[in-house]
């Protein structure tokens, strides 16, 4: 609610849908300044829109991040997050326990772009994970709660290993939502969502979100020239210098949304704003219902196995630590 407290007496109660492609400025000089500054994106709705901005601010606050940006889908959020710091000849590491569509993106599409995905078992030892790193490895990727296996990802352990190697940890927090887990608190540097699922909550709207923690030092390792070196599209601006704490999402907005058009529409942003208002209530009920179904299926003689953190064979306390007491939605 803090995001909304700047409203004055007589202001509209709900955020308006700003269905506009462009925005008004008083002079050509002002327009030129905005176009030349990658941190000022309210020039064309392919980059930014006031309704979308409201969603971004709320989700950044919920995740405890420094900045956020929306995309046209969860898959677009994943794609943009990888392409933002990886290029042909690079590699990255991903957990084997992730969404099937993401595996297809990583194993087939990224391979065709010259980017290698190296998979590691989420239960691998630290030494086994370390062995997967190469000189050209740019990031580590995992899902808080895997889709659909519901495996719980040890965010803190993978974050420590990633940081030891000078690269960020990107975590897909779609299934957990910030109500059940805030990956940034456990060391994640970038958090992404398919807002289509629990943020929207009603099966009507496709969208994605990318949240930046603001804590990762993009300059330290020298591995991320996309963020640290002068960008020719913006007269030699370095994103790390121009947007400290938000360089990652600023570059995606300025470069990848410009080039791919993977932009969330204002109407969809408005629907996500409505979904966020009931997120905690809905997730709480999902959890309650899921545990009842788990209990029923566990006792059913014709059910061989139920995938859910509360009945995991793994004695590890990870799911208790990162989630709220095994609370998660159920997928069969």
Regions found by a protein language model. Name each.
Residues 68-298, 307:
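Conserved PLP-enzyme active-site core in the AAT-like
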Residues 16, 41, 269, 329:
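A residue-level signal for beta-strand positions that form part of recognition/binding surfaces
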Residues 19-24, 28:
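Positively charged, low-complexity intrinsically disordered leader regions
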Residues 2-13, 322-332:
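Single conserved hydrophobic/aromatic residue that forms the stacking wall/gate
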Residues 64, 302-305:
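Glycine-centered tight turns that cap/initiate beta-strands
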Residues 27-79, 101-110:
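Conserved N-terminal alpha-helix of the aminotransferase class I/II PLP-enzyme fold
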Residues 1, 5-7, 193-194, 256-258, ...:
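Glycine-rich, charged/polar anion/phosphate-binding loops
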